[in-house]
Amino acid sequence: MKLRIFILFLFLSLLHVQADVIDSLMTQPRDSIGLTSDSLVLHFLEESGIPISDNNKVKLLKSGREKFIDLFEAIREAKHHVHLEYFNFRNDSIANALFTLLAEKVKEGVEVRAMFDAFGNWSNNKPLKKKHLKKIREQGIEIVKFDPFTFPYINHAAHRDHRKIAVIDGKVAYTGGMNIADYYINGLPKIGTWRDMHMRIEGDAVNDLQEIFLTIWNKETKQNIGGEAYFPQHEEQTDSTNIVVAIVDRTPKKNSRMLSHAYAMSIYSAQKNVHIVNPYFVPTSSIKKALNRTIDRGVDVTIMVSSASDIPF
């Protein structure tokens, strides 16, 4: 059976990776390792203590329309809980439809918890204001800010929650590049069409995403949510659908080199092609070196960036 590996890079974690493990893997000549790109990175992540599961079904959602149709349908089917963690919920048509649906699920007895980053909310042009949060909470939805601003504000600049996680009944999870906003479907006047991707996951990796959500939720709210109801057993996937998933979750000032090295090793070990899609392509020195050496080996390297950016600099 040919395994397909999905490596999901998230922000914020309590993981720690030994520098000597990273360096030892990175300094080995590629040919001497004798591994494919997938297995090389998988070995690196295992040595680094990253949670890896091989009993998963993964669906790639290649547009905002696909993501929100799939997510909303999964929420409609929720029986026990819905957990949402995003950098921001933009106060627009998508968020309004989402909170309306969540309020309906609360009436059915479903637990709904939502968390967003304080800076992410403040920095978007349609933030959730106090009156909006009050209405949401009155409908029985628990919603909290991650790391609200307190003086001195500069102390909170780097420690932000950029995760995009949804977990429904501990059975289905979503993660990827999209927050909650209608511009993932409609685009923006000055920018145009918005290209991003997301993933739907069923299987053991859902537990890893649930653990990430509940760790931060319990820390922020001083609650103690957990137990079997949030971590159900998952059905065994067949060989034809079984996907290996590694959840890479990091915090500022921790594991700062790990993601760069994981990307670099994937590029170094590529044999046919490397395709990169990134709107904010600012490669580190290790990524630049990996790309140059890979090109020198005759591997086709294609990089797609935005023709117009939402960042003014």
Stretch-by-stretch model annotation:
Residues 4-13:
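Sec-dependent N-terminal signal peptides
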Residues 16-313:
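Charged, low-complexity intrinsically disordered terminal segments
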